[in-house]
């Protein structure tokens, strides 16, 4: 699986994690706020117990508050909010290099 930890000063939780620094002058994003991972054609997000929380706004407008430690499946065009920052998920269709991985 591909995985990245996002935050103001993220720390890896596994040896092969990628780290994505989120610039946030207001410090609404925790140091290691959230994990995003892609495996077997699916993309998941997990909040690490951040101070200001995270949520997902689906394309239909429905918002789901993330619970610390619970992995949530993302869909294309979902908008993920971390603190006062947000980003939109764009899932690319094509060959999934992790399709042959075992659980």
Task: Kindly label every feature range from the protein language model.
Residues 6, 38, 49, 57-103:
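C-terminal boundary/linker segments immediately following FHA domains
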Residues 34-36:
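Buried hydrophobic-core signal for structured, non-transmembrane domains
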Residues 42-51:
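Short beta-strand/loop turn elements enriched in aromatics
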Residues 1, 39-40:
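Short, well-ordered loop/turn elements at secondary-structure boundaries
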Residues 10-13, 52, 60:
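Residue-level detector of flexible, active-site-proximal loop/helix-junction positions
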Residues 1-31, 86-88:
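N-terminal beta-hairpin/loop module of FHA
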């Amino acid at each position: 699986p591909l995985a990245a930890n996002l935050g103001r000063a993220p720390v890896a939780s596994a040896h092969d994690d990628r780290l994505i620094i989120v610039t946030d002058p207001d410090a609404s994003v925790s140091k290691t706020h959230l994990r995003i991972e892609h495996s077997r054609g699916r993309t998941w997000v997990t909040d690490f117990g951040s101070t200001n929380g995270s949520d997902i706004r689906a394309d239909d407008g429905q918002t789901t508050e993330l619970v610390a430690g619970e992995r949530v499946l993302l869909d294309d065009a979902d908008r993920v909010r971390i603190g006062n920052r947000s980003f939109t998920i764009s899932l690319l269709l094509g060959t999934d290099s992790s399709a042959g991985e075992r659980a």
